[in-house]
């Protein structure tokens, strides 16, 4: 009986185990075919046919265990488990074919140069160094130096691997000096890894160092362009500022090119607005096959490749010569006709930006040594990567201009692109290096011009703020800043010509519309611009639209409050839309809200936010360690690199993190400590007179003079059913205990439970400045979303007479 019972339980255990594994596989498979909303959401394989074995290992790698523990959905956990097992079992790495670039010569691989004197202060190979205490050897060192494009590799001191391109000044020593240390990669072999101050040098397999060619500026000509190329302009859109996108589209539109629009799968408002634009023009296509293109995600490359595939199947679009991608924050800084001429003259070449520095360092900074996996709208780091022996890596920017021949090769089923696509599913920021790497390992290596013809507004000390990336990627990276008055000089005409650069980024009309105007006047004929139009300096960005976004109680409270200010008897039905308005780059942001009443009437309101900040009247007391406190503000959805809150309305709910920003200005008496631009301060958070929390805010380094504290409202506050007043006191650490604060900020917290308090809050923090009650009346209000805005309006299509979109 005992034997039979044990057998039965064993059978049950087997069945349960098989059922569990089947469920894991099905969950993973489901994750690969998830649809988001009404859009076709593409999985990371994007059509690649792969066979995924079931996970069958114990995860021991700390990175993988951490990633799996942080994943939210079962399907994501299953995906990470599967890939971590493949990595552990050695089935993750792919063997690549031999490099087909003419600069590669297999006869040069491991060709010995000799043994040379080498010292720390006078290295022979100076470009890059790897420390490989467990794996160093000829094959390993050669692999690392080859992937970075170096001509030579050298072994020394057992665990040291050096890379470089020049051995002309090397001093030869006796070969026995390079046989002092066995290679740690295989202690039982007779392979040696150099000596003490002696490096043994070999060839990696490249014939010569590559000198990148760059395009040169072509001056405007009255002669028409012969056989102009057909460009597929790919607009990769995010956000809700559709007016800026339409303004950009108007600046680059020519009827003989194609415009292919991809909108992030999470941005349904932008998608709906772009659909309206596509209805007017046959050469504009908006794809319904949408990806969530998170920062650094594999999905960005998958989207780009899918656009190539899909565009070749559309009859009206399939004969393009180039695909060139842009974002919602790009703008031309030279005429589009000049750009078209340069591309045509260089037809056949692809335009790729180089990283501009040592390739070994680039590989290191980009995280190529690690395996990443995208799911749950995040890039998880799951382990170290084992690179194949013969893959040359390069990269730079993910803003590219790809010729048709290279584009077709990239989606083909040939061995190199097929295997590279698979490998790049697990590489961070894949579009920044995929086409570089594909070209440098193929016959296309000589068909490159190393410039993407763009100017990027880098300020890395400010743009490399990792805090904003923590929720979406297990890595730290950089993003460019928005052009402002002080950085517009970067794209002045002569500078743009000298590079040449035909486009620049980033532009944001809600931050500084003047920079867009400067670029526009440099790239577009003045007669096509309506510089004197009342809304020329206006910037709008949508916040809410009915049918797309979820109605929120505090929005409805504001709508009711606004409606009651008109003394109408009409009853509120729903909010139709809310937009942020900035009348010029120095103006405060205003709110434009459009609502519908129960009788079908519409009202549109201009609403001003009221600040509740009390600064001490004695300016001398606002100076702390030589820094003058100029302003205090608060908000949510904080953007670290631009130092502003993207929630323009000023609402704080129990689901938000409150960000309080101090604006400092250095005086002549400032005592700077390092690079810091602000002093240490104390923030006291109060509910009425009750102290909730006190935090010490350390000095901060900001190009804009900002200093911040983040406070999670939901975690810090509870039982928000009463009409409480909340405050932040800004206090100097050197002040006596009874001294008044330098400043006090007053803010409300809106919850569904304290809806009866909303009117009280709204009365304190908002003012109804103006309103209109019909479509015709609102068209006369300059602040209304119905008022004409010719710089971005597209209501008809292409006008042959003016040669513009109208």
Swiss-Prot record:
GO terms for biological process: chondroitin sulfate proteoglycan biosynthetic process; egg-laying behavior; heparan sulfate proteoglycan biosynthetic process; heparin proteoglycan biosynthetic process; morphogenesis of an epithelium; reproductive process; UDP-D-xylose metabolic process; vulval development. One of its GO terms (molecular function) is protein xylosyltransferase activity. It is found in: Endoplasmic reticulum membrane; Golgi apparatus membrane. UDP-alpha-D-xylose binds at residues 264, 293-295, 398-399, 479, 505-506. Pathway: Glycan metabolism; chondroitin sulfate biosynthesis; Glycan metabolism; heparan sulfate biosynthesis. Disulfide bonds join 57-85, 101-445, 464-478, 466-476, 772-778. Signal peptide: none annotated. Keywords: Developmental protein, Disulfide bond, Endoplasmic reticulum, Glycoprotein, Glycosyltransferase, Golgi apparatus, Membrane, Metal-binding, Signal-anchor, Transferase, Transmembrane, Transmembrane helix. It holds the Pfam family WSC. Its main location: endoplasmic reticulum. Residues 33-806 are lumenal. Glycans are attached at residues 89, 169, 325, 614, 655, 719. InterPro entries: Glyco_trans_14, WSC_carb-bd, XYLT. It is a single-pass type II membrane protein. Its cofactor is a divalent metal cation. Belongs to the glycosyltransferase 14 family. XylT subfamily. This is Xylosyltransferase sqv-6. It comes from Caenorhabditis elegans. The lineage of its organism: Eukaryota, Metazoa, Ecdysozoa, Nematoda, Chromadorea. The gene is sqv-6.
């Amino acid at each position: 009986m005992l034997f039979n019972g044990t057998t039965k339980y064993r059978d049950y255990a087997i069945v349960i185990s098989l059922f569990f594994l089947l469920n894991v596989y099905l969950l993973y498979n489901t994750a690969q075919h998830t649809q988001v909303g009404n859009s076709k959401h593409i999985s990371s394989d994007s059509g690649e046919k792969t066979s995924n074995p079931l996970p069958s290992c114990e995860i021991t790698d700390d990175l993988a265990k951490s990633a799996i523990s942080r994943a939210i959905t079962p399907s994501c956990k299953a995906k990470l488990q599967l890939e971590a097992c493949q990595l552990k079992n050695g089935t993750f790495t792919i063997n690549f074919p031999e490099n087909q670039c003419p600069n590669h010569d297999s006869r040069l691989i491991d060709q010995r140069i000799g043994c040379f004197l080498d010292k720390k202060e006078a290295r022979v190979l100076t470009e890059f160094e790897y420390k490989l205490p467990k794996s160093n050897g000829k094959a390993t060192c050669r692999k690392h130096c080859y992937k970075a494009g170096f001509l030579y590799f050298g072994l020394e001191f057992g665990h040291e691997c050096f890379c470089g391109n020049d051995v002309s000044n090397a001093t030869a020593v006796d070969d026995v000096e390079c046989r002092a240390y066995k290679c740690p990669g295989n202690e039982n072999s007779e392979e040696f890894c150099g000596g003490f101050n002696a490096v043994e040098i070999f060839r990696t397999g490249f014939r010569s160092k590559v000198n990148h060619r760059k395009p040169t500026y072509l001056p405007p000509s009255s002669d028409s362009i012969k056989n102009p190329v057909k460009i597929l302009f790919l607009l990769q859109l995010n956000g809700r500022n559709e007016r800026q996108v339409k303004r950009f589209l108007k600046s680059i539109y020519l009827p003989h090119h194609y415009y292919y629009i991809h909108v992030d799968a999470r941005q349904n408002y932008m998608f709906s607005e772009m659909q309206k634009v596509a209805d007017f023009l046959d050469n504009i296509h908006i794809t319904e096959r949408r990806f969530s293109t998170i920062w650094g995600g594999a999905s960005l490359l998958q989207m780009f490749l899918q656009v190539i595939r899909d565009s070749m199947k559309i009859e009206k679009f399939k004969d393009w010569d180039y695909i060139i991608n842009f974002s919602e924050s790009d703008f031309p800084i030279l005429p589009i006709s000049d750009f078209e001429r340069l591309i045509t003259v260089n037809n056949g070449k692809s335009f790729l930006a180089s990283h501009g520095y040592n390739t070994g360092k680039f590989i290191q900074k980009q995280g190529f040594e690690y395996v990443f996996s995208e799911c749950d709208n995040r890039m998880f780091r799951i382990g170290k990567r084992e690179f194949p022996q013969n893959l040359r890596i390069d990269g730079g920017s993910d803003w590219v201009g790809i010729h048709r021949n290279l584009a077709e090769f990239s989606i083909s089923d040939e061995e190199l692109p097929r295997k590279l696509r698979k490998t790049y599913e697990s590489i961070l920021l894949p579009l920044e290096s995929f086409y570089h790497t594909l070209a440098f390992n193929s016959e296309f290596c000589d068909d490159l011009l190393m410039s993407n013809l763009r100017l990027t507004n880098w300020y890395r000390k400010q743009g490399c703020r990792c805090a904003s990336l923590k929720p979406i990627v297990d890595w730290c990276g950089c993003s460019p800043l928005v052009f402002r008055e002080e950085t517009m000089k970067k794209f002045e005409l002569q500078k743009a010509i000298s590079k040449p650069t035909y486009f620049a980024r980033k532009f944001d009309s809600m931050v500084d519309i003047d920079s867009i105007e400067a670029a526009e006047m440099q790239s577009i004929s003045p007669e096509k611009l309506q510089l004197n139009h009342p809304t020329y300096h206006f910037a709008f960005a949508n916040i809410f639209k009915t049918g797309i976004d979820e109605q929120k109680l505090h929005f409805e409270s504001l709508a009711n409050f606004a409606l009651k200010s008109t003394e109408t008897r009409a009853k509120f039905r729903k909010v139709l839309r809310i937009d942020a308005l900035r009348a010029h780059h120095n103006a405060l942001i205003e709110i434009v809200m459009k609502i519908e009443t129960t009788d079908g009437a519409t009202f549109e309101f201009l609403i001003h936010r009221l600040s509740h900040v009390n600064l001490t009247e004695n300016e001398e007391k606002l100076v702390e360690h030589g820094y003058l406190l100029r302003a205090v503000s608060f908000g949510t959805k904080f953007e670290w690199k631009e130092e502003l809150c993207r929630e323009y309305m000023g609402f704080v709910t129990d689901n938000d993190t409150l960000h309080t920003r101090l604006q400092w200005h250095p005086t002549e008496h400032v005592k700077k400590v390092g690079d810091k631009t602000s002093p240490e301060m104390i923030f006291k958070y109060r509910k009425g007179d009750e102290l909730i929390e006190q935090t010490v805010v350390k000095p901060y380094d900001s190009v804009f003079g900002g200093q911040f504290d983040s406070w999670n409202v939901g975690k810090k506050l509870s039982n928000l059913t009463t009409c409480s007043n909340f405050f932040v006191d800004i206090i100097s650490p050197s002040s006596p205990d009874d001294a008044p604060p330098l400043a006090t900020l007053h803010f409300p917290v809106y919850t569904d439970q304290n809806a009866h308090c909303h009117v009280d809050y709204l009365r304190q923090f908002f003012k109804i400045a103006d309103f209109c009650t019909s479509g015709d009346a609102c068209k006369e209000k300059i602040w209304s979303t119905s008022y004409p805005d010719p710089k971005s309006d597209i209501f008809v299509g292409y006008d042959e007479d003016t040669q513009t979109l109208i």
